């Protein structure tokens, strides 16, 4: 997709910002060393490094880290936060500066986990470097909480997971007083991410196996992640401490432009004054990724622009949905006809919400760091 084509697609596009992951560099080194892009990238990394240094009271040089392609770890979690947010700001700035494509010309934007803070900042509600102070101030405690936590994907072959039952079973496991488990992300109708301390995931699996007829699968991740978006964050009073910092954070008033779909609520719920409330709830509330993905389908989004280094969860979600829809509709004349029909705006209001799923194979995904390098300017 060339620059002119991407610009024309903006009215029906959504920008998707990635969150923290075990890998956070992507192609940032290439962008930093690029003869034209380099100055903007260096400026963003330098400013983010100064903010990070100020918050954690330790010298941080993100420019050197990226130039040397030195990966972050859980022990440098604060630097990972600053790096990801800086590169997201840099990528959006490059798109504007060199191609005249503005984020505000898109229909909407959203972000997974840390990405929601970047999205809200990019939409003009907060300054990016001021907003990153909040997660940076909590980074040490988040990393410490990760030491005894395990991330796992829970999925089964039925039509949809019984979310209410899962929430209740988590509470019952927590009631035993031997650790906390909770939903971190609603990935799809039949899968969620869970975060659990100690052996809570095993005990949860044992309980749910006796409560549902369908076979439930639990796949653990060997990597360590901070237990964001779960009640585990209560243990170090992280939500309230973050909220206290936000009292005096500059800006935060006015509607985001474009509208931001919040993974806290699953919809475009930001108004002129509730950005701080959303950021507070963001810390310990599950990420409603599936609800937001489905919302983009209902909004007739045709292009997803993925922002940040090496985005993974959001692109994978759309790709998996596309593959599933194509598998279900393959060979069906009726389904192929409906897929063609939903391309016509006049008939969309006449169709049920579920028909929006048929749009999944039509969505084009653009990984911004790849696109910037493929459409490189001298």
Where are these regions (language model features)?
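Helix-rich "cap/lid" substructures immediately adjacent to catalytic or cofactor-binding pockets
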Residues: 2-110, 194
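Alpha/beta catalytic cores of group-transfer enzymes, especially the acyltransferase/condensing modules
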Residues: 20, 123-273
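Short, solvent-exposed amphipathic alpha-helical segments in soluble enzyme
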Residues: 32-33, 209-211, 320-323
């Amino acid at each position: 997709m060339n620059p002119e084509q991407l610009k024309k697609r903006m009215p029906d596009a959504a920008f998707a910002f990635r969150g923290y992951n075990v890998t956070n560099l992507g192609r940032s080194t290439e962008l930093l060393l690029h003869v034209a892009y380099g100055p903007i990238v260096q400026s963003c990394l330098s400013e983010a490094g100064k903010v990070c240094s100020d918050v954690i009271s330790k010298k941080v040089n993100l420019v050197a880290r990226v130039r040397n392609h030195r990966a972050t770890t859980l022990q440098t979690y604060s630097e990972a936060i600053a790096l990801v947010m800086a590169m997201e700001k840099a990528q959006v700035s490059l798109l504007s500066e060199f191609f005249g494509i503005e984020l505000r010309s898109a229909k909407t934007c959203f972000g997974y986990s840390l990405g929601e803070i970047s999205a809200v900042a990019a939409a003009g509600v907060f300054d990016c470097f001021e907003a990153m102070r909040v997660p940076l101030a909590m980074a040490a405690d988040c990393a410490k909480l990760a030491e005894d936590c395990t991330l796992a994907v829970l999925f089964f072959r039925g039509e949809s997971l019984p979310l209410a039952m899962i929430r209740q079973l988590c509470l019952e496991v927590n009631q035993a007083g031997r650790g906390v488990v909770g939903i971190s992300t609603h990935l799809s109708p039949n899968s969620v991410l869970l975060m659990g301390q100690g052996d809570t995931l095993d005990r949860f699996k044992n309980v749910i196996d006796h409560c549902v007829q369908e076979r439930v699968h639990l796949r653990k991740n060997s990597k360590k992640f901070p237990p964001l978006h779960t009640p585990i964050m209560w243990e170090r009073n992280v939500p309230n401490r973050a909220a206290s910092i936000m009292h005096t954070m500059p800006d935060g008033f006015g509607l985001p432009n474009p509208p931001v779909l919040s993974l806290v609520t699953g919809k475009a719920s930001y108004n002129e004054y509730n950005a701080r409330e959303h950021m507070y709830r963001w810390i310990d509330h599950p990420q409603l990724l599936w609800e937001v993905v489905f919302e983009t389908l209902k909004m007739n989004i045709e292009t997803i622009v993925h922002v940040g280094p090496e985005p993974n969860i959001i692109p994978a979600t759309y790709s998996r949905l596309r593959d599933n829809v194509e598998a279900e509709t393959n060979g069906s004349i009726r389904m192929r006809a409906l897929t063609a029909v939903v391309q016509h705006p006049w008939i969309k209001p006449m169709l049920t919400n579920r028909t929006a799923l048929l749009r999944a194979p039509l969505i084009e995904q653009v990984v911004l760091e790849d696109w910037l390098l493929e459409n490189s300017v001298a």
